[in-house]
Amino acid sequence: MTDYSRRQFLGHSLGVAGLFTATTLTSCSNLRIFAPGKPGSKMRFGLVTYLWGKDWDLPTLIRNCETTKVLGVELRTQHAHGVESNLNARQRREVRKRFEDSPVTLVGLGTNFAFHHIEHERLQKDIDGAKQYVRLSHDVGGSGVKVKPNDLPEGVPVEKTIEQIGKSLNELGRFGADYGQEIRVEVHGRKTQRLPIMKRIFDVADHPNVGVCWNSNDEDLTGPGLEYNFNLVKNRFGDTVHIRELNIGQYPYQQLINLFVKMDYKGWILLEARTKPKDRIKALAEQRMLFEQMVAKAQARL
């Protein structure tokens, strides 16, 4: 992605297509159905560009978020938006301006950097790479960078790996604080997505600028169950949460939303969709409305 011209990098801006009626667009977000002043009223719904947004260039992505009233986005790296660490200063300013000129918030950047590696060189490469994206997120107007733990390698004492991950996160937390960027640790990995393991990692990663990014995994339901596992890490939640489609599968999303409302969570609930609907715009708007209905239902229980 070298020597991008402005036209190549940012793509063509297109007019907003008339994909929804005015009634559809204002049915939830514009009317703000959350009960004002009640716990959970400051939570916001956004998109992770994992599958549904991976092939949208930046103008298309922002336009589609505006159309669906999904007004926050975490940009995954290595996707069509092209927001990567090798952007020059001018290109970074252009990305920032595109978001500033729209109602869509750039929540942050989603990377795949991980800190479980046995090889010191690979570990250091991922730490250094994450720092590059901290600088990038700062420059383009984001507020944080998502990273991963991401495993407990065979043949290495578990405590040693946990210590290594935690210390790496503390280093990034200190670095990110200088740039106003939160380090968001996705609950991810074959073994590290177990909440008791995440709790142990965060016992080491005690820097206040390092937060848990809840990831809505099946492992959340193991052992004593969702609420128990939720409570293990809730005091370390960062500003982002990842969910899947709210109406697909067996994950108890209403219970999860109830827990976030009860604790008066004020961050972003970000959809990291896995399906391949024919009409992603319609599906995205539907997920936003389902989220708002769940929040309203949770508030009514209080």
Regions of interest found by a model, annotated:
Residues 2-46, 53-69, 192-302:
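Histidine-acidic metal/acid-base catalytic patches
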Residues 13-22, 33-39, 66, 96-105, ...:
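Active-site acidic/histidine proton-transfer and metal-coordination neighborhood
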Residues 51-55, 80-81:
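Extracytoplasmic "Venus flytrap"
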Residues 61, 95, 129-133, 165-168, ...:
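Alpha-helical packing segments of well-folded alpha/beta enzyme cores
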Residues 61-78, 141:
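Catalytic domains of carbohydrate-active enzymes, especially glycoside hydrolases
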Residues 74, 108-110, 146, 242, ...:
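Conserved beta-strand positions in the central sheet of alpha/beta enzyme cores
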Residues 76-96, 152-155:
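Glycine-rich, proline-tolerant flexible connector loops at the mouths of alpha/beta enzymes
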Residues 78, 114, 150, 246, ...:
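Flexible loop residues that form catalytic
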